UniProtKB/Swiss-Prot annotation:
Organism: Lactobacillus helveticus (strain DPC 4571)
Similarity comment: family membership: Belongs to the class-I aminoacyl-tRNA synthetase family.
Short name of one Pfam family: Anticodon_1
Aminoacyl-tRNA synthetase found in the keyword field: yes
Enzyme Commission code: 6.1.1.4
Gene: leuS
DNA damage listed as a keyword: no
Record-linked InterPro entries: aa-tRNA-synth_I_CS (IPR001412), aa-tRNA-synth_Ia (IPR002300), Leu-tRNA-ligase (IPR002302), Leu_tRNA-synth_edit (IPR025709), M/V/L/I-tRNA-synth_anticd-bd (IPR013155), Methionyl/Leucyl_tRNA_Synth (IPR015413), Rossmann-like_a/b/a_fold (IPR014729), tRNAsynth_Ia_anticodon-bd (IPR009080)
Enzyme class, broadest EC rank: ligase
Residues annotated as binding ATP: K576
Protein name: Leucine--tRNA ligase
Length: 804
């Protein structure tokens, strides 16, 4: 009997002792970099959803090693961030200690699953030797003008005691914890991601990524081409700009709308409307951007009492304020053309504002007309379609100095400050004379000081502000200063970690350029789709900055990205609060790691979300036990059943073996693991029926199954007399000629009716085929007493006998 507990421990110990998965450095071999999205080491440990993506990269890594590649397959820990800090606050423990314990537990679980990580390259984002380089990247951005301080409207979460980035707000609530988010102005460190908007957009086309992820990034960047138009304010020398993608409809503008935060609002509001305007601003000040836009079904707003002048026709249009206009998007002001925009139409109907039609078509009593058509009521644009009218209007605006062609982005600069303790300190000093300087590079890392009170202050300062010995500094000239007390977001360390794996112990630079050249871009990156517009966008941005600095040799970090689906329990995402978490430790204990790995790959397509079946690992264990019994003598566990497994090949399994090698190799490359496993089951079924199995085919099959079930296959490999690990045993190949059937089935008809069939050699001689057909007893029965007039032989298919 196969004992998974004994065998799995034996091989895990062997791999660790022999450094089996140390990254290869043979210059004659090609390199392959297989990367998992590294986990946040929570106190809960792994659940069975985690190993799905990890098993996939492990299978590919193991196959690539056997195919003769140098393989880099590392693992590390995304250790800074809110969850650890929240837990530490609740329990009173030190977040550094919590992190250390959680990592130890995660690592234990990963090793029990038999993953082939090169642990010499392990990294932790909260390790000062690591975040020294996170701080170094920040300093380079600061020097290039890409990191700057600004007073900006932010997403403030009182419950978390910190600001969260736009990318971390989901449906108006924080991604972590689901707490409400409020808008307030605060001094923040920002990273100028908008400077890279075009490149982030354009370079998506060169990536082998799932189309939905690329589309999400395109939408998040939100590039739109239009015009900026300047409106004058009536009876004033003040003006404001609006951005519009439809400059062709300017003649139809019947009102304008400013963001309530727009500084002009207080200056232009008339006395008669001031109370109403101020009350409205108060009412909406806590709403998040999302609540004000996408979630905002019922448009609200108030009139300021002021009017603007439409530059194209000199007509007065009222100036309103409404929360659906954001100060942070475009110019914080819009022109409204209710006849040809659904949102403007709803607003105009609600507040009884004019609707001026400037394109022919539709029924404006029912809805806005948003399609193409000839322009009307538009003077020099009349008769033109949208495309031509846009161009002509932009030309007119530029000629009259009241507008220009403009590209706008939905993407905002990255809000990079957090008012929390457990994060990378920002290496900046604010001096009493109002200047700011970086901590000198040779003094990095700026270490996070130990603190006992890490409770958020509820102010724009982090708990670090309480550590006066750390905060207060004096330079050699006696000038006093204070360290920056905000910390970096947990996305900072994960924006470049894949680079550090290439050269993890380098204390002179982030990573050696020549080594990066050998390994980048990452060949395969597997992780959840939920990171589409956070981690994956941030990492691309940092990578492009580092490319411009000459630190990395490629424009993009990850060539091929694949999103694994979720493993659900009772059709819901696994979570502790729902009580539906399946612990892999228990599954491994009962069925073994190989059975768990195989079940997760056999459940269905890797990118599908599938419900966990408690009986699943039992069924894959059953299959693996069949493999074991077929290849290993059950009475003597160190011997092969010699009567079944032989050196001679009778050809019976040629075709199914060739099919299996071909399909498994192709399917592993395509990440179609479920169909690869199905094919291996087909082979085992055929092998069980065969009188004998060629030893060459058994060993080839064991190599194919080893990436999925490495522990059992190592053991079988040893039983077959091999001293070395199966890890670097050459990947099997097949003879394409054996994929072709050597025999064919021939149908025999007598006078058009099927009377028999037989096997013949493919492309056999016609006379031989005819003789075999005539010799069939059942055929002879129908020919008795008749003259054969004609015999038609269709090669490899049919023999038709005409008899009278």
């Amino acid at each position: 009997m196969y004992n998974h507990k004994v065998v799995e421990k034996k091989w895990q110990d062997y791999w660790a002792k022999h450094d089996t998965f140390k990254t290869g450095t043979d210059p004659k071999k090609k390199n392959y970099y297989a990367l998992d999205m590294f986990p946040f080491p929570s106190g809960k440990g792994l659940h069975v959803g985690h190993p799905e993506g990890y098993t996939a990269t492990d299978i590919v890594s193991r196959m690539k090693r056997a195919q003769g590649y140098n393989v880099l397959h590392p693992m590390g820990w995304d250790a800074f961030g809110l969850p650890t800090e929240q837990y530490a606050l609740k329990t009173g423990e030190d977040p550094a200690v919590v992190t250390k314990n959680n990592i130890a537990n995660f690592k234990r679980q990963l090793n029990k699953l038999g993953f082939s990580y090169d642990w010499d390259r392990e990294i932790t984002t909260s390790d000062p030797n690591y975040y020294k380089w996170t701080q170094w990247v920040f300093e380079q951005m600061y020097k290039k003008g890409l990191a700057y301080e600004a007073e900006v409207p932010v997403n403030w979460s009182p419950d978390l005691g910190t600001v969260v980035a736009n990318e971390e707000v989901i449906d108006g609530k924080t991604e972590r914890g689901g707490y409400p988010v409020y808008r307030r102005n605060m001094r923040q460190w920002m990273l100028k991601m908008t400077a890279y908007a075009d490149r982030l957009l354009e370079d998506l086309d060169d990536l082998d990524w799932p189309e939905p992820v690329k589309e999400m990034q395109r939408n998040w960047i939100g590039r739109s081409v239009g015009a900026q138009v300047t409106f004058k304010i009536k009876d004033s020398d003040k003006t404001f700009d609006i951005f519009t993608t439809r400059p062709d409809t300017l003649f139809g503008c019947s009102y304008t709308v400013l963001a309530p935060e727009n500084k002009l609002v207080q200056e232009i509001t008339t006395d008669g409307h001031r109370d109403e305007v101020n009350a409205y601003i108060k009412k909406i000040e806590s709403k998040s951007d999302l609540e004000r836009t996408d979630l905002n079904k019922d448009k609200t707003g108030v009139f300021t009492g002021a009017y603007a002048i439409n530059p194209v026709n000199g007509k007065e249009v009222p100036i309103w304020i409404s929360d659906y206009v954001l100060a942070s998007y475009g110019t914080g002001a819009v022109m409204a053309v209710p006849a040809h925009d659904d949102r403007d139409y709803a607003f105009a109907k609600k507040f009884d504002l004019p609707i001026n039609q400037v394109l022919e078509g539709g029924d404006l009593s029912k809805a806005a007309f948003t399609e193409d058509g000839p322009h009307i009521n538009s003077e020099f644009l009349n008769g033109l379609n949208i495309k031509d009218a846009k161009k002509k209007m932009v030309d007119w605006l530029e000629e009259h100095n009241c507008g220009e062609k403009k590209v706008n982005y939905k993407l905002r600069d990255w809000d990079f400050s957090r008012q929390r303790y457990w994060g990378e300190p920002i290496p900046v000093i604010h001096w009493e004379d109002g200047t700011t300087s970086l901590v000198p590079e040779d003094q990095l890392p700026l270490r996070l000081p130990h603190a006992t009170d890490i409770k958020p202050s509820g102010t724009p300062e982090s708990p670090l502000a309480n550590l006066t010995d750390w905060v207060n500094v004096v330079d050699e000239m006696g000038r006093k200063g204070k360290r920056e007390t905000n910390t970096m977001p947990n996305w900072a360390g994960s924006s470049w970690y894949y680079l550090r794996y290439v050269d993890p112990h380098n204390d002179k630079e982030l990573a050696d350029y020549d080594l990066l050249k050998q390994w980048l871009p990452v060949d395969l990156y597997i992780g959840g789709a939920e990171h589409a517009v956070r981690h994956l966008l941030y990492a691309r941005f940092w990578h492009k900055v580092l490319y411009d600095l000459g630190v990395v040799p490629t424009k993009e970090p990850f060539q091929r990205l694949y999103n694994q689906g979720l493993i659900l329990k009772n059709h819901e995402k696994m979570s502790k609060s729902k009580g539906n978490v399946v612990n892999p430790d228990e599954v491994i204990d009962e069925y073994g790691a190989d059975s768990l790995r195989m079940y997760e790959m056999f459940m269905g397509p890797l990118d599908a979300s599938i419900d966990w079946d408690d009986n699943g690992p039992a069924s894959t264990k059953k299959f693996l036990d069949r493999v074991w019994r077929l290849f290993v003598n059950d009475l003597d566990l160190k011997a092969i059943p010699q009567e079944r497994i032989v050196d001679k090949n009778d050809g019976e399994l040629d075709k199914v073996y060739a099919e299996t090698v071909k399909k498994v190799t192709e399917d592993f490359d395509a990440l179609h693991f479920n169909t690869a496993i199905s094919q291996m089951m087909v082979f085992i079924n055929a092998a069980q029926k065969a009188k004998t199995i060629p030893r060459e085919y058994v060993e080839g099959f064991v190599k194919l199954l080893a990436p999925v079930a490495p522990h059992m296959m190592e053991e079988i490999w040893q039983v077959f007399g091999h001293d070395e690990s199966i890890t670097y045993a050459k990947w099997p190949t097949y003879d394409p000629a054996k994929l072709v059937e050597s025999t064919v089935e021939i149908m025999v008809q007598v006078n058009g009716k099927l009377r028999g069939k037989f096997e013949a050699a493919k492309d056999a001689d016609r006379d031989d085929v005819q003789k075999q057909a005539m010799a069939l007893p059942h055929v002879q029965k129908f020919l008795e007493g008749k003259d054969v007039k004609k015999v038609i032989v269709v090669p490899n298919k049919i023999v038709n006998i005409v008899a009278k």
